[in-house]
Amino acid sequence: MTKDIEYLTADYDNEKSSIQSVIDAIEGQDFLDVDTTMDDAVSDVSSLDEDGAISLTSSVVGPQGSKLMGYYQNELYDYASQLDSKMKEIIDTPFIEDIDKAFKGITNVKLENILIKNGGGHGRDTYGASGKIAKGDAKKSDSDVYSIDEILKSDQEFVKVIDQHYKEMKKEDKKLSKSDFEKMMTQGASCDYMTVAEAEELEEQKKKEEAIEIAALAGMVVLSCINPVAGAVAIGAYSAYSAANAATGKNIVTGRKLSKEERIMEGLSLIPLPGMGFLKGAGKSLMKLGFKGGEKFAVKTGLQKTMQQAVSRISPKMGMMKNSVLNQSRNFAQNTHVGQMLSNMRGQATHTVQQSRNWIGQQAQNVKRIVNNGLDKEIAHPFKQQLAPAGMGGIKFAETTTLRNMGQNIKRAVTPQNHVTHGPKDSMVRSEGKHSISSHEMNSSKYVESPNYTKVEFGEHYARLRPKKLKANIEYTTPTGHIYRTDHKGRIKEVYVDNLSLKDGDRNSHAQRTVGGEDRLPDDDGGHLIARMFGGSKDIDNLVAQSKFINRPFKEKGHWYNLEKEWQEFLNSGKEVKNIKMEVKYSGNSQRPTIFKVEYEINGERNIRRILNK
């Protein structure tokens, strides 16, 4: 049985967003292509300048920009390359060392040496209601002291449970005798603990004939419980952990409150039933505690089921014994050596996570500072504007500028805002005041897998937030086969449809009224990226804030509406609409798109539409 310990990852997710913000700072400013872009812009402007009134020249800037980007990439690489070693140094190693210390005091406990003393009950049963672990000079021969062997065999219900587990083990080892099994259970050692260092050494020596399966990985602590039944008693009933969990109602390592069902299971750990009582139910990922029995003694099936069934079979006297141990456990957890170690471990985990948060935050700030300083450093302007009475919108260039501003000026110079747009080289069209540009090219934009996005199941693509929000940097596929990707802020970034078809879809009026949040404009609709008539999702995983002037059939506008109707007509006429790729662009942190780029094929002919969201 394997249980995990989970570290909260929110801080690390935030740092991922911090890194992405650095990338955003230079997004669209690929200086390696600046020279080519400017040459194209000059050529396109000249082709439209019939009276020759515009003169625009530029000097080479690619090498400077390339050098800066190379420096940025090196800095980011150095930062990322240190993460693994730093995580091991400040989280994995201290945690593993504390685990080693904690187990040092509770391993190899001989069960035959554990005695239970009758604390003076009310005479209603054999053991009394205040039985506790015997200390000091208690002897097995004393009339009020009982051994584990005596307790186990005192009740026929427990004998039946033991018999059941013997039969399970017998399936794994036909030669296992009943007497050997009983001896192992009542006189064996609690468990053998192997440190990570020892496990790695053993792995190197390949002593498979002596070793129990070991996964010696960074951040993984492996326990080898030779005797699962004995381990349940020693680590469950007579260490502080499970007793304290059941008594206090929370996990003493993580502080997480236990449900009623979990407390019942923790209580069952206090009686001699097979189960691993230490550090169970502590979460998922990062640190793993693997409890694995040896090949001879492993009970591979039925343990949990048997434990659950045993609830109704606990005899009254053993139930009272269990309650007594629970009552003793609060002080035991706080005052014993093991209890103190566990408490220290919890504090150490909190401390190391805080250390890592501080270190990662500092490194991210260093990277951002280096890049921003470079982008904002003033340089002599490479562009010389001689005359711009028309076409370029009267953009003014200062004597000096920064690389950041330079990129923004270039971007403004070649966008369709001033009725001039730079599309594919074989097609240059005048927008005539419209917000939709169409062209054709041979390149296909079929879906290609990317390592930059985490694939999640449909239904797992929402973050646990209110209001509802998509997870960041993920890829999900709807039941109709439409593929979506989100950016670092959980905004829909790309949509892919292999083969469009007509299907009926539902509507979510609330989502359509609220999508876009505070960035939504009064004239916005909740627009479907893939329309309902094509089986598009009704929820925010397919909705964006979209201007009603493109989403509805307005005269001279309605570009998005017209595109959907065009697809519908093609499909109704028997034509194929395939290999759709939508790119949704945003400005800054806004949840409202600024432009949509839609590529698709009609009977093999490639089309591109760029639609401004206004």
Curated annotation (Swiss-Prot):
The active site is at H528. One of its GO terms (cellular component) is extracellular region. Keywords: Cell membrane, Membrane, Secreted, Virulence. Changing H528A: Partial loss of DNase activity. Residues 417-445 are annotated as: Disordered. It is found in: Secreted; Cell membrane. It comes from the Bacteria. InterPro entries: Bact_secretion_toxin, DNA/RNA_non-sp_Endonuclease_sf, Endonuclea_NS_2, PT-TG_dom. Pfam families: Endonuclea_NS_2, PT-TG. Residues 423-435 have a biased composition (Basic and acidic residues). Belongs to the EssD family. Interacts (via C-terminal) with EssG; this interaction blocks EssD activity. Interacts with EssE. Component of the type VII secretion system (Ess). Plays a role in Ess secretion during infection. Required for the efficient secretion of EsxA. Required for abscess formation and staphylococcal persistence in host tissues. Possesses a toxic DNase activity that is modulated by EssG by forming a nuclease toxin-antitoxin pair. This nuclease toxin targets competitor bacteria. This is Type VII secretion system protein EssD. It comes from Staphylococcus aureus (strain NCTC 8325 / PS 47).
